[in-house]
Structure formats: structure tokens, C-alpha cells
Amino acid sequence: IVAPNKLHYVYMEEWSQAYPTAKVWATKGLEKIFADSKVISSYTILDKTVTMSWQSEIDYLPFEGSAFIEESVFFHKKSRTLILTDLIENIELLEECSCWHRFLFKIGDNTYPNGHTPRDLRMTFLFNKEIARKCYQKIKSWEPVNVLFAHGNCFIGDAEEKLPQAFFWLE
């Protein structure tokens, strides 16, 4: 069970209860929250030094450089699929979306079909952009074909074209 960043951990206790023998992994920044948990008694903080049982199938990288958040990035080697959480959003503005939501997504610069790292998240890398650029170069070196992420339409089969567009701010 993986908490990929400090914004995506809310149901970790429920998943831990449902699967009590599962190993729990958490990204840096969740130590205090997990230490206060009455359910999650054992967990491992993901960092560059930790050994994971899935290493032969999945590569791991902590995407660093943000003043606010560190995100765990994964790459499934066999399918050449990059797995992100919030580093790219590609929100489709459906007719049901209110004008207010449309406005927020537009200024967030994270709408379909041109998904990007959201503008507010990009700003958190302002003072450590070189660190983020090194992380981006690493994920590009994996040569993903697909990119999965938590918010919006994923990039299936066209990662080579879409990834540089999404990370234009690090190109």
C-alpha cells in the first residue's frame, strides 16, 4: 500500500485494516501523520536508499525540488508505464462543470487535451528547479509509452509526445 505524496494518504488506515499483512510505504512528509496513526503501526518511508521487493519490475524515483511536496514516481518496466499522482493533471471540462470550476481549471493550466503540471505546483519548484529538472530527465530516460496519473485523462501510447508538453517548464 503506497501513499505517493502528502496529499494522497487519506484512506491508508482503511486499506491497512482491509489488508493487515500488506507492507505500507509512504513518501517523505507523512512521518508525523503516520506516527499518530492507531492503525498503521509499521511503515517504510520511500527514499533513494530503500530496497523494495518490486525493484525488478518497477523503478522508483522521489521527484524532488518542491518547497511543498515530494511525490513518489514509479515506472512499470514491462508495460513502459510511468505512474504519477499530481505531477500531471489533464482535467476534461465536462458540460456539467460550473463556470467557477472551469475558471479554476483554466488558470491552473491543467486541462485536457494539454495536461501539465498544475501552475500552483510548478510554483513550488521555483527555487529548486534544477533538482526537479534532474528528476524529469531521469523519468524521460525510462522512455515511457504510457503515463498514468490521478487527475484526468491519462496519456496512453503517446507519452513520448505528451511528456515534454506536460513538463514544458523543465525542458
What are these language model-derived features?
Residues 11-14, 18, 93-171:
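Cap/insert and terminal regions of metallo-dependent hydrolase folds
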Residues 39-107, 134-141:
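Catalytic core of the metallo-beta-lactamase
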Residues 1-53:
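Active-site HxH/HxHxD metal-binding segment of metal-dependent hydrolases
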Residues 1-4, 58-64, 123-128:
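Short, flexible loop segments at the rims of nucleotide/cofactor-binding pockets, characterized by
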Residues 6, 29-30, 85-87, 152-153:
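Active-site metal-binding loops of divalent metal-dependent hydrolases
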Residues 19-21, 77-79, 144:
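Short glycine/proline-enriched coil/turn segments at helix->beta-strand junctions
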